[in-house]
């Protein structure tokens, strides 16, 4: 049930619109300004499309396209004109918005960042992509963790970006911190279509959490993005899915965070987000609350290592045209003169 794409708004529903944005080519500051206006105009379209829509979501790379250009002239900042325009668009149209920026980082490579702005034009969520799509993407690994906020109509909201969603731990972290709706924005192209679909559903089912997911759409003359806006209910079923590949189509649905809360409290069978930390509670009071997973202990200790680690062939971005990095995580990028 999705309220006929959100046309029939229920008392406790949250209306979501996923914009399957035409893949842009952004090379210059003028291109960036033009694409900013495209997005602003689509915020207004979303509001006209459905007066009851609470949140409009734009894909990863909505401003910058898929070139992986790290030119500082076209990188964004939180206090820059692009974010200011998005704030004004949300304020003017009385709607929450989720946007993508490639963020200037003087101490390293740019961050691939996502922001959520409320219907008053205030920045409410700021996230840096934790798992860049290596070896293809050059972005600095995110360092802010996963924030969870109170979003439209009181729903608990989290944001992850593209490749993040291929790691079950990312969706689990969102849910563990209370997220009832997890947004996943992406720039994925057609070869990832099947993996995109089943991870969106698994992230929902395994965590009793709504997932709202959208990719760029159309072609830039080199890459073909797929759209594939998907809203998955907390039981893993798909309640809205953009399969036409039509650019700038807005995929809509109503979701029910109140039913997420009800399921998390009331489900016995497959209440996996609870049962993960309470193994076998039928046999032992409260269940086993240990951490029997070797990889977790090793990761915390800085000793994460696969049995086949020494045989892995791709460990940097040279196969995709990037220089081999010489600094470690947390070390600042040295100026070229040094």
Where are these regions (language model features)?
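Active-site catalytic loop in hydrolytic enzyme cores
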Residues: 88, 105-180, 185-202, 225
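C-terminal beta-strand edge segments of enzyme domains
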Residues: 3, 148, 216-338
């Amino acid at each position: 049930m999705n309220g006929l794409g959100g046309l029939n708004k229920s008392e406790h529903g949250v209306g979501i619109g996923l914009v399957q944005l035409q893949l842009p080519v952004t090379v210059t500051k003028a291109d960036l300004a033009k694409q900013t206006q495209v997005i602003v105009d689509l915020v207004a379209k979303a509001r006209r499309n459905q007066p009851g829509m609470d949140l409009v979501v734009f894909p990863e790379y909505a401003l910058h396209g898929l070139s992986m250009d790290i030119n500082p002239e076209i990188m964004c900042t939180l206090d820059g004109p692009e974010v200011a325009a998005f704030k004004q668009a949300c304020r003017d149209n009385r709607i929450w918005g989720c946007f993508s920026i490639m963020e200037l980082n003087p101490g390293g490579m740019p961050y691939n960042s996502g922001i959520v702005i409320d219907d008053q034009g205030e920045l409410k969520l700021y996230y840096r992509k934790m798992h860049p799509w290596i070896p293809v993407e050059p972005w600095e690994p995110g360092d802010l963790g996963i924030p969870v906020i109170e979003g439209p109509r009181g729903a608990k909201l989290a944001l992850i970006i593209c490749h993040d969603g291929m790691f079950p731990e990312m969706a689990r972290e969102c849910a563990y911190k209370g997220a009832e709706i997890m947004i996943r924005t992406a720039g994925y192209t057609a070869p990832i279509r099947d993996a995109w679909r089943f991870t969106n559903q698994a992230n929902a089912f395994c965590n009793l959490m709504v997932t709202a997911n959208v990719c760029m759409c159309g072609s830039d003359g080199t890459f073909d993005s797929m759209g594939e806006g998907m809203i998955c209910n907390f039981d893993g079923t798909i309640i809205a899915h953009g399969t036409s590949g039509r650019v700038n189509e807005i995929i809509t649905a109503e979701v029910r965070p109140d039913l997420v809360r009800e399921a998390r409290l009331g489900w016995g069978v497959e209440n996996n987000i609870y049962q993960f930390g309470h193994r076998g509670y039928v046999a032992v009071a409260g269940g086993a609350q240990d951490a029997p997973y070797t990889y977790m202990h090793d990761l915390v200790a800085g000793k994460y290592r696969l049995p086949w680690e020494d045989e892995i062939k791709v460990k940097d971005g040279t196969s995709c045209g990037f220089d081999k990095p010489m600094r470690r995580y947390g070390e600042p990028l040295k100026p070229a003169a040094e």
